[in-house]
Amino acid sequence: MKRFIRELNSFVKGIILFLRPGVFFFFLSRPLLFVSNLLSLTKWVSHQKRTGILNDFYRPFRNHADRFKLYENITAKYGLANEHVNYLEFGVYKGTSFRWWVNENKNPDSRFYGFDTFEGLPESWGTYAKGDMNANLPSIDDTRIKFVKGLFQDTLFGFTDSHSIDNGIRIIHIDADLFSSTLFVLTTLARHLKKDDIIIFDEFNVPNHEFFAFKMFTESFYVKYELIGAVNNYYQSAFKIV
């Protein structure tokens, strides 16, 4: 029976390849992918705890400033204000969240790295066009910081080869927006991840982008994690590697 099923599957797949339905129906691929990822997201949400952590689900309207409540909660819960941390932020823009973490942490051994093209999005994202959200390097007076300008795909390999980021508590803040950028960052840093590392997402509940990238990454690399906080219906979410 199993052999028959395998042969039938192979035969049907061959027929489909021969007929090439993608020539006529490819326009459906993006909306179908969105529906698939949205269903995965809602299933994921149904399994997340809402007690014992900061989690405001459900709320009818989003307040982007509440992301700072998430940062404050994480900092207080894990005593990060005075700990030695390596903070890596991907998608700095004007440096608002980057500056918050620099000001909050007082440990002189901590290091803060901000990655961005500073020339805007490398590809379109939702209603944003390629090149939107460009900004100048933020002016922050602190010797512990360093900005890495360029595409993540061009800069991150060289950075990990030349910088030690395995000491202290590692905080990875992903505000990359895009599926491609998010997946690249996660897979590149996979070999560095260790227990208790913290990963924060700024647009996590966007089905086809940060959520999809995180789902593919954790499933492909067998990464175990737990949710440690979320605001704005999981738009901003934080996880700890376990």
Feature-to-residue mapping (PLM):
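Membrane-proximal basic amphipathic "stem/tether" segments
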Residues: 1-61
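S-adenosylmethionine/decaboxylated-SAM
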Residues: 48, 52-57, 72, 76-242
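Conserved SAM-binding loop and adjacent beta-strand
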Residues: 58-70
